[in-house]
């Protein structure tokens, strides 16, 4: 286990999961509903539809990506940069202090955001499968999955503190208050992008270093 913690691969993938999946589950589970109700003026039924589309995108994403990957010319690790870039682009409207996404397009936005932010975890885990010996892939994967839950929990706390600091004791928030809070999530997406760059730059050398763990795993 200590050998796993010493590898760059482990930390780059862990940071990616902490930032991307932690942010996705925190945002979709805690703030997306109130944001679209209070900020965009949707009723609960319409907001629930957007939440459903977020979940649908994250569910269909891995299957869709697995189907398309063999037909794409990008390497699997390069797809992480695509996911982060698309997430940043789709998340940009959340930073604006006024509604900019037409209500009719919100379900489509939800599916797309779910796919790119919550559907690329399988691609990230191929880094572990490629760089670690089979004997410890399961251990390394289990250790990395912890960061999804850790990221979600900590980001819910941090975002709650930000909103409470802006409007102490308020039961509802304004769109500008949400937009300032979403800076935290965009920062997480930028960190995930940086982690993807490190993973790509690491190249085949990481596999050579990680393969040295095989003797210790026996």
Regions found by a protein language model. Name each.
Residues 1-14, 216-218:
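Juxtamembrane intracellular "pre-TM" segments in multi-pass secondary transporters
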Residues 7-65, 152-160:
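Extracytoplasmic gate region of multi-pass secondary transporters
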Residues 62-75:
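Helix-to-loop junctions at the C-terminal end of transmembrane segments
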Residues 96, 178-214, 218:
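Multi-pass alpha-helical transporter architecture, strongest
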Residues 131-168:
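A late C-terminal transmembrane helix in Major Facilitator Superfamily
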Residues 161-188:
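A membrane-interface helix-boundary motif in multi-pass transporters
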């Amino acid at each position: 286990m200590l050998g796993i913690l010493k590898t760059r691969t482990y930390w780059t993938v862990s940071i990616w999961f902490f930032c991307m999946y932690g942010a996705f589950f925190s945002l979709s589970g805690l703030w997306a509903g109130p944001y679209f109700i209070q900020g965009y003026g949707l009723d609960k039924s319409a907001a629930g539809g957007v939440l459903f589309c977020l979940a649908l995108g994250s569910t269909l994403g891995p299957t869709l990506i697995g189907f398309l990957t063999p037909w794409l010319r990008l390497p699997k690790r390069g797809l992480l940069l695509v996911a982060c870039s698309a997430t940043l682009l789709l998340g940009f409207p959340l930073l604006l202090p006024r509604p900019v996404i037409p209500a009719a397009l919100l379900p489509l936005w939800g599916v797309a955001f779910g796919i790119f932010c919550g559907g690329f975890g399988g691609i990230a885990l191929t880094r572990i499968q490629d760089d670690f010996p089979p004997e410890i892939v399961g251990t390394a994967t289990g250790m990395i999955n912890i960061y999804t839950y850790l990221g979600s929990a900590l980001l819910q706390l941090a975002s709650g503190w930000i909103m409470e600091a802006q409007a102490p004791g308020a039961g509802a928030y304004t769109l500008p208050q949400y937009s300032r809070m979403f800076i935290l999530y965009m920062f997480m997406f930028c960190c995930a992008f940086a982690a993807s760059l490190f993973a790509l730059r690491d190249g085949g050398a990481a596999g050579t270093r990680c393969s040295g763990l095989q003797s210790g795993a026996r």
